[in-house]
Amino acid sequence: APQAGFYGVR
């Protein structure tokens, strides 16, 4: 699961 991706997109 892309944790950094979630926050990165947000």
Curated annotation (Swiss-Prot):
This is Locustatachykinin-3. The keyword Secreted applies. Its main location: secreted. Keywords: Amidation, Neuropeptide, Secreted. It is found in: Secreted. The modification Arginine amide is found at R10. GO terms for cellular component: extracellular region. GO terms for biological process: neuropeptide signaling pathway. Myoactive peptide. Stimulates the contraction of the oviduct and foregut.
